[in-house]
Structure formats: C-alpha cells, structure tokens
C-alpha cells in the first residue's frame, strides 16, 4: 500500500481545543494531552517521542496536529463537542492527507467559532490572545458555508486525487460499517432496557403490547 501523500501548507481544517487557565489568562490546549498552544498567532510545532525518532507527521505514526476536512459530518462533530472550542486550524509545513482529514507538522488557530450558546467573553479573550478571527455562527451549516465561501480546506475531488479514489471508497465503506455497528448496538441496548423495565415492574400484564419510542414491545 502506498504511503499517504505529503503536501505543503498552508491547509485549513476543522478541529477543537480545550481551555485551561485562570479567567483573563486562558490558553487553548490540545483536547487529549492538555498541552497549551502558543498565543499571539505563533505556530505550534508538533513533536513526537516515538522511536525511531522522526519529524511529524510520521507515515507510520499518529503524530502531528490533527484536523478534519470541512464536511457536513466534521462540522457537526466539532460544533457538538461539549466543553471544547471549535475552530479552524491553519496548518503549515509537511501535511499528511487522509480521506477524512490531515496531520500537520505545525499550525495555529486561524479562527474560533462562537455558537449561539457559547461563552462570548471567553471566546473574545481567546481570539484576541491568539490573534485569531472570531466567527459568530449559528451552527455547523454556517461553519461549512464559511469554509466554502472563503476557500478553506481541501475539496473532496482534491482529496480523492491526493489519496486515491480507492482509499476514499474504503473510507466511506468503513464509516458505513461503523454507523451500522452503532445502530445495532443501540438497538440491543434499547431491547435490554425494555426488558429491564418489564422485569422491574411486576404489575405489567403478560402478553400486553407496550408502545415506546422504538415501536411496539410485546411483554412475554
């Protein structure tokens, strides 16, 4: 299998950040490790301690700064992450492109997204601290439209040319499999819950048909 393509930045993608620090001194952090990102528009340089030592993004590693291509699913994902700040990453240096996103050698928050129920004073302070644009948007659709209008992110045809149409098809097939697995697991969970409710209520009449959100459930 060929290695994922490396392309030069800048490339833009969607991601989220955590927030740490006292009021007035907040800093954006990586949502996984919690490492602070440098303010003032500076680029964060990705590092990796996995041996053998290499420069991020490594082809056989998961290192680098991660972001999603601007798509409906990714916009919903970043806007729906509780306790995190959605935004747009400006990636530079070597960038390894994948069907759903990319990993970059370095990057900075180019824009932060303030949603209708977001903390406006906090986002205003963070945008000023990071010299980032503050986008006041009403949801994922508006974020995706902003990216399309301003030419931010790699389009699906460009990604397909970079990673190959076969890998794109494989990626879509894998996402469909994951959706089916989730739906099947959720259905099993609902059946178990329905069974628990029936067992927990000794006054339930056997043979009775119960109506719930998932449809009819017949009491054995």
Where are these regions (language model features)?
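ADP-ribosyltransferase catalytic core
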Residues: 52-124
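C-terminal single-pass membrane-anchor helix
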Residues: 169-220
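Juxtamembrane amphipathic/hinge helix adjacent to a transmembrane helix
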Residues: 147-173
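Short, aromatic/basic amphipathic alpha-helical patches
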Residues: 120-131, 147
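N-terminal "first-domain core" detector
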Residues: 1-44
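Short acidic-hydrophobic, aromatic-tinged amphipathic segments that line or gate anion-handling sites
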Residues: 133-142, 157
């Amino acid at each position: 299998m060929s290695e994922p393509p490396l392309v030069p930045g800048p490339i833009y993608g969607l991601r989220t950040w955590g927030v740490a620090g006292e009021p007035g001194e907040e800093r954006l952090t990586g949502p996984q490790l919690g490492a602070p990102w440098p303010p003032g528009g500076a680029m964060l340089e990705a590092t990796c301690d996995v041996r053998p030592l290499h420069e991020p993004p490594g082809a056989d590693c998961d290192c680098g700064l991660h972001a999603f291509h601007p798509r409906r699913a990714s916009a919903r994902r970043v806007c729906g992450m509780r306790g995190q700040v959605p935004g747009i990453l400006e990636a530079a240096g070597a960038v390894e492109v994948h069907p759903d996103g990319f990993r970059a050698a370095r990057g900075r928050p180019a824009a932060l997204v303030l949603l209708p129920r977001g903390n406006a004073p906090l986002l205003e302070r963070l945008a000023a601290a990071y010299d980032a644009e503050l986008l006041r948007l009403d949801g994922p659709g508006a974020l995706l439209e902003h990216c399309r209008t301003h030419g931010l992110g790699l389009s699906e045809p460009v990604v397909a040319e970079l990673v190959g149409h076969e890998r794109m098809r494989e990626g879509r097939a894998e996402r469909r499999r994951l959706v089916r697995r989730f739906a099947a697991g959720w259905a099993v969970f609902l059946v178990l819950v329905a069974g628990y409710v029936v067992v927990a209520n000794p006054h339930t009449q056997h043979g009775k048909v119960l109506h719930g959100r998932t449809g009819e459930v017949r009491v054995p």
